[in-house]
Amino acid sequence: MADKGWKAAERRYARAVGTTRIPVTGERHGADYKTELFAYQLKIRKVIPAWLFEWLHGICSTAGKDQVGVLVLNRPRCRTGDALVVLRHSDWVDLHGEIEN
């Protein structure tokens, strides 16, 4: 039986950071893959707000040659520490990928 698309995606993204996919254990919010330092949960969606990609592209375009563009998102009156940090997967892999477990 062929893999579901999401399983193949989890394997592909896990390989990019030097690890393997964790099989589903029934935990609703469990990690899809882990490294020594990070626990990842991958979400592939048909619809993600276009403005998010536009804003990320904007900061990546203006970042210097040796800089990584990072988009920080938060809601009004929310704690600074709860903000989301978004960067391109390719930049993440450049920084943290190919890690041997």
Model-derived features: positions:
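Catalytic phosphate/metal-binding cores of nucleic-acid and nucleotide-processing enzymes, i.e., regions
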Residues: 1-101
